[in-house]
Amino acid sequence: MEQKPSKVECGSDPEENSARSPDGKRKRKNGQCSLKTSMSGYIPSYLDKDEQCVVCGDKATGYHYRCITCEGCKGFFRRTIQKNLHPTYSCKYDSCCVIDKITRNQCQLCRFKKCIAVGMAMDLVLDDSKRVAKRKLIEQNRERRRKEEMIRSLQQRPEPTPEEWDLIHIATEAHRSTNAQGSHWKQRRKFLPDDIGQSPIVSMPDGDKVDLEAFSEFTKIITPAITRVVDFAKKLPMFSELPCEDQIILLKGCCMEIMSLRAAVRYDPESDTLTLSGEMAVKREQLKNGGLGVVSDAIFELGKSLSAFNLDDTEVALLQAVLLMSTDRSGLLCVDKIEKSQEAYLLAFEHYVNHRKHNIPHFWPKLLMKEREVQSSILYKGAAAEGRPGGSLGVHPEGQQLLGMHVVQGPQVRQLEQQLGEAGSLQGPVLQHQSPKSPQQRLLELLHRSGILHARAVCGEDDSSEADSPSSSEEEPEVCEDLAGNAASP
C-alpha cells in the first residue's frame, strides 16, 4: 500500500532518525540511546527496582504524563503533542504492531496509540511558555524549601549551656559597668563644636599636622577610657587568673581595639558621628585632625558596617572579651591558657548568637570577620598609609598616646622632652619658660597637663626603655600593683 505524501513513513521518526552522517548512514541521536545508557540514569526512589516502562518495556525512569515510562517514550510523546505530529502518523500493518524496546521506533502510530492506551495524558504536555513558567515555579518552590531548611537548622543550633550563660552574664555585666553612659549615650552625648578640629595647623616632628584644640578635647577623655578598658578586663575571671606580665601585654594589645569598637558601635548614621567614651560626638575630620590620622577612617567604616548588625550589650561584651584574650600578642607566657579562654568566649559567643536568632544570613561568620576587621584595619591601615611598622598605629606618636595602643610610650615622651628641654624631666624648663611657646612645646605641655602620662601605670613603660634609666627598675612593680588593685586614674 502506497503512503500518502503528507504521511510520515512507518519507522521514520522525524526527531530520532532524521540526522545522517556525511556518508549517508544514520547517526544515533539522544532519543535513540542504547539500553546501557538508558539504564544508567537517575532512578527515583519511589520506583521499584527494575520497574519497566508501560509502553515499551524498557527500564522506567519515573512518572511522565501520569504513567511510569522510560525517557524515550516520554520524549516521543512530548514531541508528538507539542508539534502535533500524530495526525501524520500511519501504520503499514493496520495498527497491529507490537511495541517493545526493539520495535518502538519502527511504527510511530502504534507507539502513540499505546501511549494513549496506557493512560499518558495529552493535556499535561506543556508548550514552551508554560514549560518555562513551570520551571520558574519549581525553582521558587526549591528556594522556599531551602529557606525552610535553613530556618529549621538555625532552630536546631545549640544554645548556651548553663556554664556558658555564667560566662556570658559576667562579661555582659563587666561591659555595662564600664561602658560610659550605657544605653543613654544618644541623650547624654555632646557634639564637639564644628569649629574645632577642622584645620590641622600644628606640625609634628614627623611632618604630620594636628589641631591642638581638638587634641586637647580628646586628651580629657582618653585616660578615663583607658581606665574603663582595664576595669572591664579585671572583671573577667579568666583574665584575672593570668600572670601580671601577660595581663600587661594583653591590655597593651587590645586597648586601642576595644576603645575603637566601643566608639564604632556608637556610630550615628543620621549625624555621621562617633561618640567617644560615651559623651563626645565627633565627625570624621575632627577625629582625624585631632590626632588619629588615617585610623579615623577605619573606625568610621567599622561603625557603618556594624550598624547593620544591631549588636546588643552582650554581643559587644563578648566581642571585647575575644579581642582581649588574643594569642596574637608577642611575649605572652601562658599562651595555651589564653587560647583556651578565647575559645571558651568564642563558643559562648556563637551559642548566644544562635539564641538571638538574627535575621542576617550567615550572621556568625560575618560577625567573626568583623572581629578580625577590628584588629587588622585598626592596627595596619595606618601603617600601610604612613609606611610605618605594622605593630604601630601608623600615626604620629601623640596619636598613639591619644588612643592608648601602647599607652604613652616612655621613650617617645622622653625624646620629645630631650628635644625641647631637660632630658627625662616631667617639668623641664621648657614648660616653665615664659617666652612664646612653639607648637611642640604646647603639645608637650598638653600631654603633661592632661594627665595622660599617668596612664603609664596601666600598661607600663615600653620594653625599649633604656636599661640605665633611674625609673625603669621601679615601674614594673607599680604596674602589677595597679593591675591587682584599681586601674590608673587620670
Curated annotation (Swiss-Prot):
Subcellular location per the Swiss-Prot or TrEMBL entry:
Nucleus
Q: What is the effect of changing residue 263 to V?
A: In CHNG6; no effect on T3 binding; no effect on thyroid hormone-dependent transcriptional activation
User: Zinc finger spans (NR C4-type)?
Assistant: 53-73, 91-115
- Where are the annotated segments for Disordered? 1-32, 457-490
- Disulfides per UniProt: none
Q: Which controlled-vocabulary keywords does the entry list?
A: Congenital hypothyroidism, Cytoplasm, Disease variant, DNA-binding, Metal-binding, Nucleus, Receptor, Transcription, Transcription regulation, Zinc, Zinc-finger
Residues that, per the record, bind Zn(2+) 2: 91, 97, 107, 110
Q: Which residues form the signal peptide?
A: none
Which named protein is this?
Thyroid hormone receptor alpha
